[in-house]
Every structure is written in C-alpha cells, then in structure tokens.
Amino acid sequence: MGLPIITHYENRQQFLSSLENNPGLIFVKFGAEWCEPCKLIEDDVSRHFLSMPDNVQCAIIDVDNSLDVYAFLKSKKITQGIPTIICYNKGNTHYAPDDVFSGTDKNQLAQFFKRCLDEL
C-alpha cells in the first residue's frame, strides 16, 4: 500500500512545501464534485493512484475546497480547466510541473501515468 492520498491544500505555501518533500513523484488531480468530465475518469484515476509505489504521493483536490492553489496554478497557465492532473518529479520545487494531463481520454490518461512513472 502506498502513501495516503492528500485531499486538501490549505494554501499555495502548503502545496509548494509538499513539492520540497517529494518522495519521488507527486500527482495532483484537480476536479470538482459537480464536474461531469471529472466523473468520467474518476475510476481510472483512483485505480492508478491506489496502485502507486511507496515513493509516489497522490492528491485528489476539489478546486472549490482548495481555491487558492487552483487559482494560483491557473494564473500561471498550468491548469486551464478540470479535470487536470499534474506530475512533479523529485527535485522540482517550482510550481511548473514536469507533465500535465487534461481531459477525459482514457488512453491518453494511461499514457500519461506510464510516461511519468517511467521517470522514477
């Protein structure tokens, strides 16, 4: 069993602090309870997150509950909408991620996870 899934960032400082403590990879999925496209990939994302090795930290963030972090990343053109998953490699302590997935294409989602995990 991997690390517990993070479900909330109080603010962007807490988010950036998590990057400094990156165990190997960090995946952050941004979505919302009301988001229909988010629901389309929810099971696939959960399956991937639950099968991660111990050096991968995952977060499932509701944009309505972590608005500071989402708005900050959106202002930097990191996220354009939801669902979006961003990936940070160990050593990247900057807000710009190493890889990004946005949308609902399940094949592209699987390729995104494979591509990121190949960097471990």
Model regions and ranges:
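Eukaryotic short linear interaction motifs
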Residues: 36-37, 67-69, 94, 108-110
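N-terminal leader/targeting and pre-domain segments
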Residues: 1-26, 59, 107-120
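Short amphipathic alpha-helix with an adjacent loop that forms part of the alpha/beta core around
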Residues: 17-19, 70-77
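Structural signal for hydrophobic/aromatic residues that build the beta-strand cores
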Residues: 15, 27-28, 58, 85-87, ...
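Thiol-based oxidoreductase modules, predominantly thioredoxin-like and allied folds used
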Residues: 6-10, 30, 42, 46-70
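Local sequence-structure signature of Cys/Sec-based thiol-disulfide redox active-site neighborhoods
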Residues: 14-50
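Structured beta-strand/turn binding interfaces of compact recognition modules in eukaryotic regulators
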Residues: 31, 61-64, 88-90, 104
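Non-catalytic, surface beta->alpha helical segment in thiol-disulfide oxidoreductase systems
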Residues: 80-120
